[in-house]
Amino acid sequence: LSIRRQRQMCIRDRHYDIIHFQWPEEVVGWTCNDPDIIRRLEERISFFRSRGARFVYTRHNVRPHYANGIISRAYDIIESQSDIVAHMGRFSRDEFLTKYPDSQNVVIPHHIYQYTYKEDISVERARQYLNLSQDAFIVTAFGKFRNREEIRMVLGAFRAWDEEHKMLLAPRLYPFSRRNSYGKNFIKRWISKAGYYLLMPLLNRMYKLQAGANDELIDNCDLPYYMAASDVIFIQRKDILNSGNVPLAFLYHKVVVGPKVGNIGELLSETGNPTFDPDDKKDILRALEEARRLAAWGQGEVNYTYGMENMSIRKVGQAYAQTYKQAING
C-alpha cells in the first residue's frame, strides 16, 4: 500500500470524540474545484458521526473572500452538520440563528496572541528597527488590501486627515509586484514592475506613506515591530466578520479604529474604540481624530487590560473545553 493510502486507512480506523472545524477551506482545499469533494465531505462526516464523533465549528467567516460554488457548499454542509457553532461575537451568533434557528451556539472571543510574538518592544526600538520617524503619528493597516475600494477608502481618508505628523504604515497596500505574476502577458508584467519600482516610491513620498506590495508577506519576526511602532491600528475592511488584528493590537496596548460591521464593530464599540461607516469619509476622519485623542489618553492600556481579562489563551481555552464537554454530553 502507498503511504497516503496507509494514512487514510489509519485515520478511518481511529475514534474521535470531537472533530473541530476552523476553516472549511482547509477541509476541501483552499482553491478546490472538484465537485465530487462535496459528496466525500458528506460521507466522511456521516462516517465519523456513526462512530460517535461530535462536531464543533468556529465561525471565522460568513464566506471566504474569494469563494467559488464548491467552497460555499462546503460551508453550508459544515454549518448545518456541526453540533455546536462557536462565534467570536453576538453579531455572528444572531446572524447565524436567522439561517439556522435550531442550531446550538456559543460565543467565545478571539484569543489574544500571548506567547506567540516578542512582546517587550518599545515604540522607540521598533521605529528604529523599521527605520521610521520617531516623531510621526503612525497609523498601521495590516494585511493585504483586497480591492480598490479598500485602497480608496484608506488613502482618501488619510490624505484628507489634517494631522501634521501623520504616517500611514501599510506593508501590503499596492497591487504591484516585482515577481513574474502575469506569466507571458508582457504588458501587465511591465506595468506591475513599473508600479513597484517607480510609482510606489513616488506615492510614498507624496502622501506620507510607508507602504509595500500586497503580495509580500510580513515576516513573523518583523510583525511585532510593526505593531509596537504604531500609535493606532486601522482595520481597512469594508465588510468583514472578524479580524485577528484587533486582539493582536490589544496585546500590544494599541488603540484600534475599524468599520462598524460584524463582530469587529461590536467589540470596538464595547471597549471604547472608535468605529466608522466605511462608505462615509467624514465619519472615517472623525474616527481617526478620536483615535488620536484616545491614544494620548491611554486607551491602549485599557485595551490591554480588557484583552488579558476577557481574551486570554487560558480563558478562551477553558471556554472551548467546556464546549467540547457540552457537545459530547448533548
Regions found by a protein language model. Give the residues of each.
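Conserved donor-binding/catalytic core segment of Leloir-type glycosyltransferases
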Residues: L132-E149, L155-F158, L169
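A charged, aromatic-enriched C-terminal amphipathic alpha-helix characteristic of glycosyltransferases
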Residues: K282, A295-N329
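Single conserved hydrophobic/aromatic residue that forms the stacking wall/gate
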Residues: L1-R7, I11
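Conserved acidic donor-binding segment of nucleotide-sugar-dependent glycosyltransferases
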Residues: S269-K282, E289-A296
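A short helix/loop element that forms part of the nucleotide-sugar donor recognition site in Leloir-type
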Residues: K118-L132
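Nucleotide-activated donor-binding/catalytic signature segment of Leloir-type glycosyltransferases, i.e.
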Residues: R178-Y225
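Donor nucleotide-sugar binding/catalytic pocket of nucleotide-sugar-dependent glycosyltransferases
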Residues: S80-L97, P101-K118
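Short hydrophobic beta-strand element within catalytic cores of glycosyltransferases
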Residues: I235, V255-G258
